[in-house]
């Protein structure tokens, strides 16, 4: 069955889950829900902040989600709307029912969708406390767990958007639950976010590609029109329309594919990834990423703020983090796609991109002492097909800090590569996920870990792990960040230390059979992370202070620690996240290197 024949839920508004009082069609109700939000009732709900309860409401009006059986419209990767002949697509989300709570409202915890944070009791250990906090952060939709909010500080009167379920933030939470044997929340998250993928998303009359996954979503509880005693819960996604800078989240779809594969490998339940709607969702993401454009490089071209670093930090272009996630998602998707006639061209394009991307990153992004010396001696302005300095990099770009910082043993992938520009900053997530996904060779993977060990006082210090190194300072900070007061030197994304990166470090270390690196980092974190109330990030060069604007009880700081502990206890479980080096790619790369450049006849340019 081709992509155009598959039923995908799509509607112009928030998905409404109705009380028994409502018998209207689902799509009509959802559209009405969207109009109501923009017209009146939800304007006031947006202003609500902090936990709000409606005693007895949930007992009187039990939310009963309708199964998504009536969904008839589907969107293809090219944005065309197609009618499906299937009367009942049984790929529904409403088949899971677990009593619970829900968090709702943009910037607020809304209505019966939430209960006040319980009094925190002192746990018997750091790990016990982390599990307690993680479970408190769970969000429920119609009685079923669907994700975790970004931060759950009971003393925070202004949570902004930290009470939303962010796709990237939920990944370590989802992995923690998978490793614990609690699969339902991950399954629900995967399927509910899939339904959000095809919803209408516009900003200033422009719509992005149909495969885009949201950055986050909220569960709202709102009253039903015409019935004062009935309520409905709606999922309200944000595709970047409300984000700072209004940037679409490129990494959301890539993380979704990675989590989907991890769910299947950990739970053994392959029926989810084999569902027609899930297969279609994978294809839509791939079509969006593999679409032809003007770029000559196999890397994904993105704007600033499209990934974990979601503010202006000079990573526009081809940032390493996106390329590593892209490569990993391509491998995961190829593993999960079911063979069918309509997928042949997509699989072919996927394989070609894997080979080109692997070669490009390994060859041009890699720096160690030897490569740095080559760049230092580059000739410039080379006009030829066999130029050594293909991107016309000027040797003066090699910063003095790097000459002193690069160790004799070790290396890393630079942060970005564009014509006449190499971003030599070390970005932790991109390098670690290059190891996990086998985008880095075995030699390069060990060299990255060697560098982390060698530069432990810079990258780990008193709290793992620097998101990037070094920080932008002085005039460079003013020009590149726009004088961003949140990204001051050695703070937030500009050289801040993020505890959530513990789990990526652990997966990478275990994959290379060097778990002692992760164990040492976990030991450093345990000294103070619970005492400091699980901050989002740390400031200063050695991570001595809690970040100036750091949220406390940050969920992915909690989950990142838990995943690291779980994987160190059961190292074999790291296989649900890692990719083995692909023999076909290795053969293709070795063939390309042996073949070299063909000697061309003399040509004349007219």
Swiss-Prot record:
It is an enzyme of class 3 (hydrolase). Coiled coil: none annotated. Belongs to the glycosyl hydrolase 100 family. Residues 97-126 are annotated as: Disordered. This is Neutral/alkaline invertase 3, chloroplastic. Signal peptide: none annotated. Its EC number is 3.2.1.26. Mitochondrial invertase that cleaves sucrose into glucose and fructose. Gene3D superfamilies: 1.50.10.10. One of its GO terms (biological process) is sucrose catabolic process. PANTHER family: NEUTRAL_ALKALINE INVERTASE 3, CHLOROPLASTIC (PTHR31916:SF28), PTHR31916. GO terms for molecular function: endo-alpha-N-acetylgalactosaminidase activity; sucrose alpha-glucosidase activity. Its main location: plastid. It is found in: Plastid, Chloroplast. It comes from the Eukaryota.
């Amino acid at each position: 069955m081709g992509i155009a024949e598959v039923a995908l839920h799509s509607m112009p508004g928030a998905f409404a889950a109705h009380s028994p009082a409502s018998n209207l069609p689902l799509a009509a109700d959802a559209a009405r829900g969207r109009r109501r939000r923009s017209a009146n009732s939800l304007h006031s709900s947006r202003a609500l902040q902090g936990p709000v309860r409606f005693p007895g409401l949930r007992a009187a009006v039990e939310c009963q989600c309708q199964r998504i059986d009536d969904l008839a419209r589907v969107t293809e990767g090219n944005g065309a709307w197609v009618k499906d002949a299937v009367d009942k697509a049984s790929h529904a989300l409403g088949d899971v029912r677990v009593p619970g709570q829900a968090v709702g409202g943009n910037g607020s915890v809304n209505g019966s969708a939430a209960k006040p944070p319980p009094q925190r009791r002192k746990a018997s250990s750091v790990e016990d406390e982390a599990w307690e906090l993680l479970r408190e952060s769970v969000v429920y939709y119609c009685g079923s767990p669907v994700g975790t909010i970004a931060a759950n500080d009971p003393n925070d009167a202004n949570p902004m958007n930290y009470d939303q379920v962010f796709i990237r933030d939920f990944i370590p939470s989802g992995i923690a639950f998978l490793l614990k044997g609690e699969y339902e929340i991950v399954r629900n998250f995967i399927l509910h976010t899939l339904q959000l993928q095809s919803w209408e998303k516009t900003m200033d009359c422009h719509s992005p590609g149909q495969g885009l996954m949201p950055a986050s979503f909220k569960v709202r509880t709102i009253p039903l029109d015409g019935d004062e005693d009935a309520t409905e819960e709606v999922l309200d996604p944000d595709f970047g329309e409300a984000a700072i800078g209004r940037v679409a989240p490129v990494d959301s779809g890539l993380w979704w594919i990675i989590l989907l594969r991890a769910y299947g490998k950990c739970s053994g339940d392959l029926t989810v990834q084999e569902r027609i709607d899930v297969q279609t969702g994978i294809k839509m993401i791939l079509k969006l990423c593999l679409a032809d454009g003007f770029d000559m490089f196999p890397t994904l071209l993105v704007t600033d703020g499209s990934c974990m670093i979601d503010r202006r930090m000079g990573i526009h272009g081809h940032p390493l983090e996106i390329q590593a996630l892209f490569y990993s998602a391509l491998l995961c998707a190829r593993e999960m796609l079911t063979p069918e006639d309509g997928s042949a061209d997509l699989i072919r394009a996927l394989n070609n991109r894997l080979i080109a991307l692997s070669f490009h990153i390994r060859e041009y992004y890699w720096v160690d002492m030897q490569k740095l010396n080559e760049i230092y001696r580059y000739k410039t302005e080379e006009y030829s097909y066999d130029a050594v300095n293909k991107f016309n990099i000027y040797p003066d770009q090699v910063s003095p800090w790097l000459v002193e910082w690069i160790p004799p043993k070790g290396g890393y992938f630079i942060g970005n590569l564009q014509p006449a520009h190499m971003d030599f900053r070390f970005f932790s997530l991109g390098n670690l996920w290059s190891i996990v996904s086998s985008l880095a060779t075995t030699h390069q993977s060990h060299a990255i870990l060697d560098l982390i060990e060698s530069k432990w006082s810079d990258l780990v210090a008193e709290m793992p792990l620097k998101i990037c190194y070094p920080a932008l300072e002085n005039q460079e900070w003013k020009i590149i960040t726009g004088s961003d007061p949140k990204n001051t030197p050695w703070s937030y994304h500009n050289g801040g230390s993020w505890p959530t990166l513990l789990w990526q470090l652990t997966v990478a270390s275990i994959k290379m059979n060097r778990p002692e690196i992760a164990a040492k980092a976990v030991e450093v974190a345990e000294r103070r992370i619970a005492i400091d109330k699980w901050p989002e990030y740390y400031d200063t060069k050695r991570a001595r202070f809690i970040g100036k604007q750091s949220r406390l009880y940050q969920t992915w700081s909690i989950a990142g620690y838990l995943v690291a502990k779980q994987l160190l206890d059961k190292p074999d479980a790291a296989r649900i996240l890692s990719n083995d080096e692909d023999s076909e790619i290795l053969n293709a790369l070795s063939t390309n290197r042996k073949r070299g450049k063909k000697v061309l006849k003399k040509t004349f340019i007219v």
